[in-house]
Amino acid sequence: MRKIIINGGKALSGEVAVSGAKNSVVALIPAIILADDIVILDGVPAISDVDSLIEIMELMGATVNYHGDTLEIDPRGVQDIPMPYGKINSLRASYYFYGSLLGRFGQAVVGLPGGCDLGPRPIDLHLKAFEAMGVEVSYEGENMNLSTNGQKIHGAHIYMDTVSVGATINTMVAATKAQGKTVIENAAREPEIIDVATLLNNMGAHIRGAGTDIITIQGVQKLHGTRHQVIPDRIEAGTYIALAAAIGKGIKITNVLYEHLESFIAKLEEMGVRMTVEEDAIFVEKQESLKAITIKTSPYPGFATDLQQPLTPLLLKADGRGTIIDTIYEKRINHVPELMRMGADISVIGGQIVYQGPSRLTGAQVKATDLRAGAALVTAGLMAEGKTEITNIEFILRGYASIIAKLTALGADIQLIED
């Protein structure tokens, strides 16, 4: 069993570069199946989710070369075969294969997706959109069968009942090679959606409105190869900004797009965090006094649900009482009992997280229950006095590229141990 050992209480300094966006690349890789030639992605993060996606692509017949942060995929050999259940079940973003396989073959046999357990994340919105485009859905054991019964998937006017990044991207990808026009209303607006649309348009798609709540896709017959730069990971950037404010004595975070983090930065400024925003970087100063605030997550451009857990350790340094309300994922509270083990004055009351600061954290044995909870525990371990041991670290490695090396370069006493 692998674990992370941290000897905390040491102020960090230096510079850390943000990697490419996990939430983009997990959708970009499956979308490449639609291309008729080689596609190259630059800025691909070295995370285990990427390794899993590469393995799935190779099992399906794609030729893949991955060197440094450059990923080259030739999808011409991809075959219409049932997808490997084991890998699919471990990867929530595997549902992005639905849209790309439907767009290319008009059918798909896939296992139901896995990933972090954050409460209900139904794929009903995806399936409702596919059905509007002529797809029939059936189930056999642990597999889901999607088929157009030999017909070409067709365009449709689709209204998303709730704002969903995954359903918006999946529908957009499927519609790219559909017959006719597709309109998605109440679409999600996240930067990762724009990134996927940019890749597809560079491959020859006709997509307008990505980043707004109405996206229009005019189907095309062929998509060609291209080269694409993955956007920076705004969640990784936010994690390091919060970490820098919590335990830093001057840290510069580079490869940052400020416009993707405006709501997050605004809440930090409300706390009293001192920082300087540069063209593609943010310098976080050593902090003095901070005040407690209330966080309420909402769809982009609101406060990202993926950032409420990584921010929590910093909130524990603030003076006063505050609350965290996650309106997106109701079970995103699993980091709370782990932080309590470390001495945090924090609890869950009526589905809301309530904290009283400042809390003095001490090292403890804790368990990462999901990706962003794991990030919170790493920051808490760096803040705490003494030794912190984090288990279940596979969640952390799913989404944070080279996290041990990056933190070590800032001066952290942190190790990944193989038991």
From Swiss-Prot:
UniProt-listed NCBIfam families: murA (TIGR01072), PRK09369.1 (NF006873), PRK12830.1 (NF009470)
Biological source species: Streptococcus pyogenes serotype M18 (strain MGAS8232)
Recorded metabolic or biological pathway in which this protein acts: Cell wall biogenesis; peptidoglycan biosynthesis
Family, as annotated: Belongs to the EPSP synthase family. MurA subfamily.
This protein's name: UDP-N-acetylglucosamine 1-carboxyvinyltransferase 2
Compartments where located: Cytoplasm
Reaction catalysis annotation: phosphoenolpyruvate + UDP-N-acetyl-alpha-D-glucosamine = UDP-N-acetyl-3-O-(1-carboxyvinyl)-alpha-D-glucosamine + phosphate
EC number: 2.5.1.7
Sequence positions that bind phosphoenolpyruvate: K22, N23
Database matches in Pfam families: EPSP_synthase
GO molecular function, one term: UDP-N-acetylglucosamine 1-carboxyvinyltransferase activity
GO biological process, one term: UDP-N-acetylgalactosamine biosynthetic process
Listed InterPro entries: Enolpyruvate_Tfrase_dom, Enolpyruvate_Tfrase_sf, MurA_subfamily, RNA3'P_cycl/enolpyr_Trfase_a/b, UDP_GlcNAc_COvinyl_MurA
